[in-house]
Amino acid sequence: MQPSSPSTSHCSQVSIKVQHKIAKKKPIRRKRVDLDCGCSYYLHLNCNNHGFTHRGTHHCSSGREWRFYLGDKQSPLFQDNRTQPEAISNEPRHHFHSDKIQPQHQEGNGDSQMFSRLPNLDDITASDWSFLKSI
């Protein structure tokens, strides 16, 4: 069937399946980091100043240290090629506590807002109990 438009340059949107296939073919820019315990992880090259704890040791990807491989079987040489801008500010946040234990709310003896309309447990009838058990 011939197109209804006389124009020869028809523009159509690329389907999402084709876009996904193209995106999957793009190489992932990441580096492999080997830990002292023998484990390794892959770090995206645009990711810096994020850390995690593994087997009791804290690891931080500062971005200043990168691996330059000399060959197949040679050890990696660590070099400091640049300084990345700091991604996390040092400002204190609302959840920052210098001590490890977070303060707990005090328990009260009065009615809470949630249970303020409940009747006294002594006033609950047998039919109320059977209804609650059926739930």
UniProtKB/Swiss-Prot annotation:
Sequence segments annotated as region (Transactivation): 120-135
Motif Nuclear localization signal per record, residues: 17-32
Chain intervals annotated as zinc finger (unnamed): 37-54
Keyword check for Zinc: yes
UniProt keyword Ribonucleoprotein, yes or no: no
Primary site of residence: host cell
A family per Pfam: Gemini_AL2
GO cellular component terms attached to this protein's record: host cell cytoplasm; host cell nucleus; viral capsid
Gene Ontology MF, one: structural molecule activity
Subcellular location: Host nucleus; Host cytoplasm
Record-level GO BP terms: symbiont-mediated suppression of host innate immune response
Biased composition (Polar residues): 77-87, 101-115
Region (Disordered): 77-117
Sorted UniProt keywords: Activator, DNA-binding, Host cytoplasm, Host nucleus, Host-virus interaction, Inhibition of host innate immune response by virus, Metal-binding, Phosphoprotein, Suppressor of RNA silencing, Viral immunoevasion, Zinc, Zinc-finger
Description of post-translational modifications: Phosphorylated.
Top-rank taxon, per record: Viruses
Notes concerning its domains: The zinc finger and the transactivation region are involved in PTGS suppression.
Family the UniProt entry places it in: Belongs to the geminiviridae transcriptional activator protein family.
Job of this protein: Multifunctional protein that modulates host antiviral defenses and promotes host attractiveness to insect vectors. Acts as a suppressor of RNA-mediated gene silencing, also known as post-transcriptional gene silencing (PTGS), a mechanism of plant viral defense that limits the accumulation of viral RNAs. TrAP suppresses the host RNA silencing by inhibiting adenosine kinase 2 (ADK2), a kinase involved in a general methylation pathway. Also suppresses the host basal defense by interacting with and inhibiting SNF1 kinase, a key regulator of cell metabolism implicated in innate antiviral defense.
Subunit structure: Monomer. Homodimer. Homooligomer. Self-interaction correlates with nuclear localization and efficient activation of transcription. Monomers suppress local silencing by interacting with and inactivating host adenosine kinase 2 (ADK2) in the cytoplasm. Interacts with and inhibits host SNF1 kinase. Binds to ssDNA. May interact with host RPS27A.
Protein name stated in the entry: Transcriptional activator protein
Lineage: Viruses, Monodnaviria, Shotokuvirae, Cressdnaviricota, Repensiviricetes
